[in-house]
């Protein structure tokens, strides 16, 4: 669809994340939530003054391990609420925005690195008094999860089936559509088709349209095709979140300079790790999953419960197939 037609059809879209996040600057674990009605984000102050917006779902399950979901590049926590809410039926789930995106704010002068993002995750877990966590890292978030596992201060648990970093025990990890270093990709930061005379709104919409189109594969997009209605829905709500292009560029730079994969050899070989990666992924080449298997030999593939080709999906994996019937069973089975 033409970007100008999107702008016209979405002209009434107004931001609802900005101005809705909490004003507390120290982390306060929220009361138990009804997962179907996620609350507005709270804020957690980092040591350098950055503020990380977060939500906690499924607080009634806080006695068990907490699932921490780590976003990919340019993504905000609302982008995977369709998956987080069902997962919170059986466990506590923590969602957050990386600094500079959505409800989170950086200091403005920090060097954005994968290691810094990993540090933010650990500090948030400490502030929420979490002790045992599972990690679900999607795309760039998978690289952040690897940086946590291979943190210089990480120590194996006595049974060598987990790691402990600064008092946080990581017991299970899902690496979704991710990579071990700067990946092979069809995505380009300047890939959006933006007319020279485009307005600021049109530029933002064109960038969002391009980014979303990369989440799927061409065969499922277009009038009457299965993923078009999902992409349209994401377009309609897409401008509601803060996604500065300069923050996305800084995240891309962080991916490009990350050199931590050789430290994966120190990850305990009995720590359960699952990989999921669709063969139609245009953001992160399918073969990147084989690199994860090479550096983390204990990693095992996780497949949706569907008939036919179980890897016939693109980058935004949980938009493909039904979450409740296809994705929840294997995810819950692995996490439990």
Model-assigned labels for residue ranges:
Residues 33, 43-106, 110:
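Conserved HGGG/HGGXW glycine-rich cap/lid loop of the alpha/beta-hydrolase fold
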Residues 72-75, 139, 279:
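Active-site glycine-rich loops that stabilize anionic/oxyanionic intermediates
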Residues 95, 100-136, 140, 151, ...:
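Active-site loop/oxyanion-hole signature of alpha/beta-hydrolase fold enzymes
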Residues 157-203:
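Flexible "cap/lid" loop of the alpha/beta hydrolase fold
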Residues 184, 205-256, 261-266:
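Conserved alpha/beta-hydrolase catalytic His-Asp/Glu region
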Residues 275-277:
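Short beta-strand/loop motif that positions the catalytic acidic residue
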Residues 280-284:
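Acidic catalytic loop of the alpha/beta-hydrolase fold
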Residues 298-336:
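Catalytic active-site module of serine/aspartate enzymes centered on a nucleophile-bearing elbow/loop
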């Amino acid at each position: 669809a033409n970007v100008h037609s999107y702008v016209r059809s979405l002209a009434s879209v107004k931001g609802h994340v900005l101005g809705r996040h909490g004003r507390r600057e120290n982390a306060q674990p929220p009361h138990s939530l009804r997962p179907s009605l996620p609350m507005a984000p709270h804020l957690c102050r980092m040591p350098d003054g950055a503020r990380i917006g977060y939500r906690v779902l499924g607080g009634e399950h806080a006695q068990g391990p907490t699932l921490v979901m780590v976003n990919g590049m340019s993504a905000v926590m609302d982008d995977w609420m369709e998956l987080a809410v069902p997962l919170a039926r059986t466990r506590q789930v923590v969602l957050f925005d990386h600094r500079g995106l959505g409800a989170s704010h950086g200091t403005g002068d920090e060097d954005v690195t994968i290691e810094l993002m990993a540090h933010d995750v650990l500090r948030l877990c400490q502030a929420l008094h979490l002790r045992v966590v599972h990690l679900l890292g999607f795309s760039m978030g998978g690289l952040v999860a690897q940086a946590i596992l291979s943190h210089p201060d990480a120590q194996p648990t006595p049974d060598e089936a987990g790691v402990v970093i600064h008092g946080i025990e990581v017991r299970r990890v899902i690496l979704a559509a991710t990579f071990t270093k700067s990946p092979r990709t069809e995505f380009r930061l300047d890939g959006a088709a933006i007319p020279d005379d485009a307005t600021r709104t049109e530029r933002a919409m064109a960038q969002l349209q391009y980014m979303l189109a990369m989440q799927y594969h061409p065969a499922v997009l277009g009038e009457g095709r299965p993923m078009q209605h999902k992409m349209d829905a994401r377009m309609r709500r897409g401008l509601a979140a803060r996604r500065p292009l300069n923050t996305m560029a800084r995240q891309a730079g962080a991916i490009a300079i990350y050199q931590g994969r050789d430290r994966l050899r120190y990850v305990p070989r009995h720590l359960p790790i699952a990989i999921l990666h669709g063969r139609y992924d245009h953001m992160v080449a399918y073969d990147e999953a084989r690199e994860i298997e090479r550096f983390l030999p204990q990693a095992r593939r996780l497949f949706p419960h569907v008939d036919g080709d179980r890897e016939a999906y693109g980058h935004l994996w949980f938009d493909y197939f039904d979450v409740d019937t296809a994705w929840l069973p294997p995810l819950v089975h692995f996490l439990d």
